[in-house]
């Protein structure tokens, strides 16, 4: 009984620590081949479904082509009615030919208008598509070539006729004659003598020098 009481009062043993797999074990586990999950549909069943889908698509295409042929026949029967040429004279045949030519010209005009509208719509669609690509940043950037160009040619291309005026920087500078520069240098060089003369130090220097 004492043993049973001690066993009941003791806490349950802790579970064994889970051993983590090392990176090498994980790598080996990832690279080793595993059994692929079996598909619920067999290969023969897949082939049968694909064949059935192709047959349905073929029937749909044939039906659409038949509908287009029927619409074309109905349009031609309403627009191109059979001609009644029995008992017509030469003048009446000429009038009929003129009427037919007028109808042909009208149809050509309508066809031209429709083609112009279609071309305009295609151009607008292409422009909108290009704008969408530009906004998304997925447009194809053209390859740029390196071009050697001088500074003068670059300014000429940017400014045009004003390039010469802007490049002529000396025109805005003040022109100084050579005589004026010599005079300024002479005046600057004699500033010590002028100071000595004003302060009365010139005579004292002569006494020391003598």
From Swiss-Prot:
GO molecular function: actin binding
Keywords: Acetylation, Actin-binding, Muscle protein, Phosphoprotein
Gene3D superfamilies: 1.20.5.350, 6.10.250.180
One annotated GO biological process: skeletal muscle contraction
Keyword match Nucleus: no
Keyword flag rRNA-binding: no
Annotated spans, Involved in binding TNC and actin: 129-149
Record's comment on post-translational modification: Phosphorylated at Ser-22 and Ser-23 by PRKD1; phosphorylation reduces myofilament calcium sensitivity. Phosphorylated preferentially at Thr-31. Phosphorylation by STK4/MST1 alters its binding affinity to TNNC1 (cardiac Tn-C) and TNNT2 (cardiac Tn-T). Phosphorylated at Ser-42 and Ser-44 by PRKCE; phosphorylation increases myocardium contractile dysfunction.
One GO term describing the cellular component: troponin complex
Modification sites for N-acetylalanine: 2
Residues the UniProt record annotates as site (Involved in TNI-TNT interactions): 80, 97
InterPro entries, per the entry: Troponin, Troponin-I_N, Troponin_I, Troponin_sf
Pfam family, one: Troponin
Subunit structure: Binds to actin and tropomyosin. Interacts with TRIM63. Interacts with STK4/MST1.
Protein family membership: Belongs to the troponin I family.
Function: Troponin I is the inhibitory subunit of troponin, the thin filament regulatory complex which confers calcium-sensitivity to striated muscle actomyosin ATPase activity.
Name of the protein this chain belongs to: Troponin I, cardiac muscle
Originating species: Felis catus (Cat)
């Amino acid at each position: 009984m004492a043993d049973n009481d001690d066993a009941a009062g003791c806490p349950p043993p802790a579970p064994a620590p889970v051993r983590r797999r090392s990176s090498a074990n994980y790598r080996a586990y990832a690279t080793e081949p595993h059994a692929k999950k079996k598909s619920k549909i067999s290969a023969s069943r897949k082939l049968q479904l694909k064949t059935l889908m192709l047959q349905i698509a073929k029937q749909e295409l044939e039906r659409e082509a038949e509908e287009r042929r029927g619409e074309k026949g109905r349009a031609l029967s309403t627009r191109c009615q059979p001609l009644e040429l029995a008992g017509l004279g030469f003048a009446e045949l000429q009038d009929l030919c003129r009427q037919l030519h007028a109808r042909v010209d009208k149809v050509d005009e309508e066809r031209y208008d429709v083609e112009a509208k279609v071309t305009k719509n295609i151009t607008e669609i292409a422009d909108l598509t290009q704008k969408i690509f530009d906004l998304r940043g997925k447009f194809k950037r053209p390859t740029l070539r390196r071009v050697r160009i001088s500074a003068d040619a670059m300014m000429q291309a940017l400014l045009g006729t004003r390039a010469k005026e802007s490049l002529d920087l000396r025109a805005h500078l003040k022109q100084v004659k050579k005589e004026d520069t010599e005079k300024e240098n002479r005046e600057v060089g004699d500033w010590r003598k002028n100071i000595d003369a004003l302060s009365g130090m010139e005579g004292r220097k002569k006494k020391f020098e003598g």
